[in-house]
A protein has these predicted regions:
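A generic fold-level signal
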Residues: 20-23, 43, 100, 168, ...
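ALDH superfamily catalytic-core signature
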Residues: 107, 115-256, 275-278
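Short, solvent-exposed loop/beta-turn-alpha elements that line the ligand-binding surface or hinge
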Residues: 262
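Glycine-rich nucleotide-phosphate-binding loops and adjacent flexible coil segments
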Residues: 269
C-alpha cells in the first residue's frame, strides 16, 4: 500500500546498504469490545485498509449493529466487497476458535478482558499469528500528603467517570495517604453523590446505565464483598431501584487489602479508596 513506507539506511561499516520493505501481513482477525464499538473498530480497520489487508471483524455481541453500519458505510464509499467481513454471534468462542486456527489467518487483534486475551494467545500459538492485544487494566490513582485535595478530586472525577467507568483506561483504585484520606474521601463522595443518574437521552443526566444486568450484578458483587469485609460506602453502594441497569456512583472508604475490589477491574462507577502511610 502506498501509505506504508519502508526504510533505507547505510550499514555502520559503510560498505552495504540496508533496505527494509513493508508488505501487508495478510488476512487479519479483529475482535472489538462493546464499550467503544466504533472507536475500537476504526482504529483497527483503518490501519489494515492502509496496509492492504483483508479483515474478518467479530464485534461484541452486545453491540453488533455499530460495526454492521460501519461496514455498510465503507462499502458505500468504495471499499471493495470482501475486504471487510463482519461476523456477528453470541457464541464468540465457538465461532472464533476455528478462524484463529485457520491456516489462512495471519494476524489477530483483540481489545477486551485479560482473561479472554490469554485464551486467544493460547489458541493463536498453533499458527504463530502476529498479535496485537489491548487488554483490561487496573489503573491506580495516587494522592500524596502534599496534594491539592480539590485538584485531586477534580482529577479523580475525570479519571473514574469517563464512560461511567466502563473503560480500561479508567482509574480503578484510589490510593490516598492516610493524613488526607478523610478530606479527599468526603469531597470525592460529595461530587460522586451529586451526579444525576438516568437515561442518557434526558437533558442534565450525567450517569447512564451499565451495559447489561450481568455487568451491574458483577459491580454490586464487588461492592458488597468490600462492605462485608469492613469497607464503608460513603455514597451509593447499591443498584438504583427501578427499570434499567443503573448503579449509583459509589465511593468506598476503609477498603481492606482482603477485599476483591482493589485487585479487580470494576468496569463501573465505583471508586474504592484504600489508604497508605509510606
Amino acid at each position: 500500500a502506498v501509505r506504508i513506507h519502508g526504510r533505507y539506511a547505510v550499514a555502520p561499516n559503510g560498505a552495504t546498504r540496508l533496505i527494509t520493505t513493508k508488505q501487508p501481513v495478510g488476512p487479519t482477525l479483529m475482535i472489538t469490545p462493546w464499550n467503544f464499538p466504533l472507536a475500537m473498530g476504526t482504529r483497527k480497520i483503518g490501519p489494515a485498509i492502509a496496509a492492504g489487508c483483508t479483515m474478518v471483524v467479530k464485534p461484541a455481541h452486545e453491540t453488533p449493529l455499530s460495526m454492521l453500519a460501519l461496514a455498510q458505510l465503507l462499502e458505500e464509499v468504495g471499499l471493495p466487497k470482501g475486504v471487510l467481513n463482519v461476523v456477528t454471534t453470541s457464541h464468540s468462542g465457538a465461532v472464533m476458535e476455528p478462524l484463529i486456527r485457520d491456516s489462512r489467518a495471519r494476524k489477530l487483534t483483540f481489545t477486551g478482558s485479560t482473561g479472554v486475551g490469554k485464551k486467544l494467545v493460547e489458541q493463536s500459538s498453533e499458527q504463530l499469528l502476529r498479535l496485537s492485544m489491548e487488554l483490561g487494566g487496573n489503573a491506580p490513582f495516587l494522592v500524596f500528603e502534599d496534594a491539592d485535595i480539590d485538584a485531586a478530586v477534580a482529577g479523580a472525577m475525570l479519571a473514574k467517570m469517563r464512560n461511567i467507568g466502563e473503560a480500561c483506561t479508567s482509574a480503578n483504585r484510589f490510593f490516598v495517604h492516610e493524613s488526607v484520606a478523610a478530606e479527599f474521601s468526603e469531597k470525592f463522595a460529595a461530587r460522586m453523590g451529586a451526579l444525576t443518574v438516568g437515561k442518557g437521552t434526558v437533558k442534565g443526566v450525567e450517569v447512564g446505565p451499565l451495559i447489561t444486568e450481568k455487568a451491574r450484578a458483577g459491580v454490586d458483587e464487588l461492592v458488597q464483598d468490600a462492605v462485608a469485609k469492613g469497607a464503608r460506602a460513603l455514597t451509593g453502594g447499591a443498584p438504583v431501584p427501578g427499570k434499567g441497569f443503573f448503579y449509583a456512583p459509589t465511593v468506598l472508604a476503609d477498603v481492606p487489602a482482603t477485599a476483591r475490589v482493589p485487585g479487580e477491574e470494576v468496569f463501573g462507577p465505583v471508586a474504592p479508596v484504600p489508604t497508605f502511610r509510606d
